[in-house]
Amino acid sequence: MTIAVCPGSYDPVTAGHLDVIERSARFFDEVHVVVAVNAAKTPMFSDATRVDVIRRALDKAGCKNVTVSSTDGLITDYCKKVGATVIVKGLRQNGDYEAELGMALVNRKLAGIETLFLPADPILEHISSSIVKDVARHGGDVTGMVPDCVVPMLADALAEERQRKD
């Protein structure tokens, strides 16, 4: 059985993330989507919220061979724990490749785990979690950029953010 891990901060999960996860689920027997803590980022949503939203979106998509969890440790340690032999990452643009290649080489050195890069669907390659949050912060419509369940959640989080600033 081939097990893959799709790590990310998923803050929030986007249509592009889901596309990569769903495509991965067609190639591998089992896929683990892992909400990973990124010390360089301050998340808008808790780990538990991100896990829950991804689960709901994948249930709606009918992905049966996908597990969703979180970790604050090394992704390679998580891979070893679940028996994963590959990490799957989506690539949108050249900048993604440069950033992800270094991590892929470290993961190979640490644990012998290979990274498979899936190119983004051209229709979705402009979407990132940061862009989604920025568009929403400025009153733009993010429908179609994120799963339907994220739209009201994002609006609520931004309303709370505005209240804290006032």
From Swiss-Prot:
Q: Which residues cross the membrane?
A: none
Q: Which Pfam families match?
A: CTP_transf_like
Q: Supply one GO molecular-function term.
A: ATP binding
Q: Which UniProt keywords apply?
A: ATP-binding, Coenzyme A biosynthesis, Cytoplasm, Magnesium, Nucleotide-binding, Nucleotidyltransferase, Transferase
* Residues at which ATP binds: 9-10, 17, 90-92, 100, 124-130
> What's the EC number here?
2.7.7.3
SUPFAM superfamilies xrefs: Nucleotidylyl transferase (SSF52374)
- Catalysed reaction equations from the record: (R)-4'-phosphopantetheine + ATP + H(+) = 3'-dephospho-CoA + diphosphate
Recorded metabolic or biological pathway in which this protein acts:
Cofactor biosynthesis; coenzyme A biosynthesis; CoA from (R)-pantothenate: step 4/5
Query: Which compartments does it reside in?
Result: Cytoplasm
Q: Identify the GO cellular component terms for this protein.
A: cytoplasm
Q: What InterPro entries would the database entry show?
A: Cyt_trans-like, PPAT, Rossmann-like_a/b/a_fold
State the NCBIfam families in the record: coaD_prev_kdtB, cyt_tran_rel
Family the entry assigns: Belongs to the bacterial CoaD family.
**Protein name from the UniProt record:** Phosphopantetheine adenylyltransferase
Species annotation: Bifidobacterium longum subsp. infantis (strain ATCC 15697 / DSM 20088 / JCM 1222 / NCTC 11817 / S12)
Q: What does the record give as the organism's lineage? A: Bacteria, Bacillati, Actinomycetota, Actinomycetes, Bifidobacteriales
